[in-house]
Design a protein with these regions (language model features):
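N-terminal secretory/targeting leader peptides
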Residues: 24-112, 132-348
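Bacterial N-terminal signal peptides
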Residues: 8-17
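Short, solvent-exposed loop/beta-turn-alpha elements that line the ligand-binding surface or hinge
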Residues: 110-133
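Bacterial N-terminal signal peptides that target proteins for export
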Residues: 1-9
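Sec/Tat signal peptide C-region and signal peptidase I cleavage site
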Residues: 19-23
Length: 348
């Protein structure tokens, strides 16, 4: 923990060094995207619009990877005020509060339309919980896209995952992997490529675009496009910093991040088909941001879809609710009345 705070202080000092003395209010923005990512242009465009809005703001960008920060620490970083705006993978950050993972539990919302409805239903209580627990406000919620299986050995159905080591990044994903007879391995995204290369993991779960831009097809051979979630991300702002902004500045930030959210949802609905095409060597395959490979694509069996749905309903939801209720006694009721309602699911 001491190492975390030392690293955080050094990173914050680095971010602050570029501020200078001018009339604009700096927005210390910590991002998880890099130039290779399909989501990078949309976030950069939002930052440029904030700076050009005339509201007296200047977006100063830093990256988790460049600074050596852990994405799972995002909530602590925004709560501490080390950064004003922080983006994070919600499932990773939920180690600090299981309630947050409820927005995208494995097997609940496995296509973009269902996921959008779930996010819209959960947004208000998600934002409220973020405010109560972490002193932050939610400005954008968006997905990377369908989370599917990439393996470095033949895989045709979920049965082929038995005994394999599968990279996971959320608690509910690990529960699904265990139920399939595989072993979940928690590995940060930057370390997945060498882990697959060296046999630390046999498979990994991520979106097609993240896998392609992360060069996973160089170390995997088979792709099972069975979506188990949407990998929800969020842009959060420190509430104390937000309160110091004037109404024009708050309006500019809200407007531009809402537009970014819309752009990233639209991207998630389209970019992953191109990424899949590129990974299996099929046209059309846009030259950027993806690279063409020759992976083998498996067909998704209806029985596997039903299997994921059943594991989610009978195991994942109840296990998550048990964890969540320890920290938030109204957790189950809140979920049933929001996402459960729109997805026609009830946690008993």
């Amino acid at each position: 923990m001491l190492r975390f705070w030392r690293t955080m202080a050094a990173a914050a000092a680095l971010a602050a060094s570029a501020h200078g003395a001018d009339a604009q209010t700096p927005v210390r923005w910590l991002s998880q995207t890099a130039t290779v990512h399909a989501q990078y242009p949309a976030e950069i465009a939002a930052m440029e619009r904030v700076t050009a809005s005339g509201a007296g703001l200047r977006a100063d960008r830093s990256e988790f990877m460049v600074l050596g920060l852990n994405l799972a620490d995002a909530l602590r970083l925004v709560r501490s005020g080390s950064y004003d705006v922080v983006s994070t993978q919600v499932g990773l950050a939920s180690r600090d509060d299981p309630f947050l993972e409820g927005i995208d539990l494995i097997g609940v919302s496995t296509n973009m339309n269902d996921l959008q409805a779930a996010v819209d239903a959960y947004r208000e209580i998600f934002d409220k919980r973020i405010g109560e627990r972490f002193g932050a406000k939610v400005l954008a919620i968006w997905p990377f896209g369908p989370q599917v299986f990439f393996c470095n050995q033949p895989i045709k159905t979920l049965d082929d995952l038995k005994t394999l080591r599968v990279r996971s990044f959320t608690p509910s994903m690990s529960k699904l992997i265990e139920a399939l007879g595989a072993t979940p391995v928690s590995i940060p995204f930057p370390e997945v490529y060498p882990s697959l290369q060296r046999g630390v993991a046999n498979c990994g779960v991520t979106s097609p675009t993240s896998a392609n831009t992360g060069r996973w097809p160089e170390v995997t051979t088979h792709l099972l496009p069975l979506s188990v979630s949407g990998s929800i991300q969020a842009h959060l702002v420190n509430a104390a910093w937000w309160a110091k902004l004037n109404p024009q500045q708050q309006e500019a930030m809200t407007r531009e991040l809402r537009q970014m959210e819309k752009d990233l949802w639209a991207l998630a609905r389209t970019i992953n088909e191109d990424a899949t095409n590129c990974s299996i060597g099929k046209e059309p395959c846009a030259p950027k941001p993806h690279v063409k490979y020759t992976m083998t694509l498996a067909d998704v069996a209806p029985a596997d879809l039903e299997r994921v749905r059943k594991i989610s309903a009978e195991l994942v939801l109840t296990e998550w609710a048990t964890r969540c209720e320890r920290a938030y006694p109204n957790c189950k009721q809140a979920w049933n009345g929001t996402i459960g309602k729109v997805r026609n699911l009830t946690i008993p």
